[in-house]
Amino acid sequence: MIPVLEAVPNFSEGRDRTIVDAIVDAISVHDVEVLDVSMDPDHHRSVVTFIGHPAAVEGALVDAAEVALERIDLRSHAGVHPRVGALDVCPVVPVHGLEMSDAVQSARRIGEGIAELGIPVFWYGEAADEPGSGLAPLRKGGFESFVGGWPSGRIPDLAAGRTAAHPTAGITCVGARPVLLAWNAWVEGLDREALAEIARLIRERDGGIPGLRALALEVPRQGGLQLSMNLEGVQARDPFDVFLRVEGHVEAAGGHISRTEVIGMIPDTLVFPAATHRLRLSEPDPSRMLSARVQRHALDRTERDLRTVVEWVLGAGSEVPVDIRDAARLLAGRATTKPSPGEDA
């Protein structure tokens, strides 16, 4: 099975398209596919989603970190979203033919490459020494809290030879994690204080919805107030049920959700439960989703055809040039990689 790793790096630039384009260009020269680029001027942040073979993804992320180092200066950066680095957060996700342990090894190699640029690195998520460690404690106080030295209890895993954050690029949090749902909800009819109370009520950290992280933010450039949310453990949760619970808190306080947006990509497996609720399907069956079945069919055909070619090349022996035989052996090795549990795309 062909291994596919997803990367969802967050960069502290959401207003200058030329800088974001330069970052995306640095990623695109590698053998990866860029799936989405989301820029937000209020957050002053961009999220790039791309997939590829782990080695290509690793190289693309280190090159993107170098462009961010050259083009982003946190000393003049101000946005409503917390940040500690030019390349702020760098998660990788095993989406096909990989175990989480493979993603952790990729994250470690990426972090080492970023540290070689002179940027200190913290591990988080499954890549942390204590797997599952979150981002919130690392980002407390933002970039400014690291400028004068390492805060108590927050020493980077890779200090890059420094005793404080890089003066312009800060630090980078590198992690491995399962798929999550990142989405924002625009709220009308409430003030900032009321929305902050709702964020406190719904997030897991304060005893709310399991797996949910939430921030109440003012977004003046786009107008209004926003709940910025991440839902973790989505394979075991119904995002639509989470939305209804969040909406219930907002309406109970006298407001309403005017619209929402997804940041990055959303798997079919997360859309289906919402459709089931809204359409009141009597026999919900995810296997009947056409897009998922077509994807599976195309992938099976591709792997079958590739296996046929590889077997022919390896069986032909000396009749085939040595470099082609070497490539076939490499592909044969990749094809034996075990699939990851809970695969999503």
Residue ranges and their predicted role:
Residues M1-P341:
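Long, contiguous binding/interaction regions
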